[in-house]
Amino acid sequence: NSTATALNQKAIARRFAKEQGTKYEELDLIICHLGGGISIAVHQHGKAIDANNALDGEGPFSPERAGTLPAGQLIDICYSGQFTKDELKKRISGRAGLTAHLGTTDVPAIIKAIEEGDKKAELILDAMIYNVAKAIGGAATVLYGKVDAILLTGGIAYSDYIISRLKKRISFLAPIHVYPGEGEMESL
């Protein structure tokens, strides 16, 4: 849920600040939560000032969510008569993203398939990584490129495959620090 993710982001930001010997309120950060949904938030001097609405599928596509979709085509689908409102909501958030393309949200299983030569899985997972990197790059513009650090968190942050490829695309923006896991209960 988005409230828990926001709490997790603040907790991770405070932990990072403490590790750096500074205060959260003195930092400008991009925090990317990599889970069933992918949220990217800009934290400026102790306040979250911008974020995508990952719960409704905005931003990069993820294991369960479609990500930002072309509005015109979405309108066509909505009025096609093929789907109910609930069916469409499930197709955008829950049965979308990696699930729609590869039939699973299991990132380690997808990576294993890639290692065994599955080119489709590699293409889809690399597309997700590309979309995450692009969104993080866009978030950097909110801070005029003056980003103290990029913090990566969530269950997918355990994946060396994803983190290493993400770092290749975004390391020029700011130092990257990885805090794998959800950590949402500790944040409460």
Where are these regions (language model features)?
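Gly/Ser/Thr-rich loops at beta-strand to alpha-helix junctions
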Residues: 33-39, 156-160, 184
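Acidic-glycine-rich active-site phosphate/pyrophosphate-binding loop
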Residues: 41-52, 161-171
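Short glycine-rich phosphate-binding loop at a beta-alpha junction
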Residues: 144-156
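Short, glycine-/Ser/Thr-/acidic-enriched flexible segments
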Residues: 47, 106, 157, 183-184
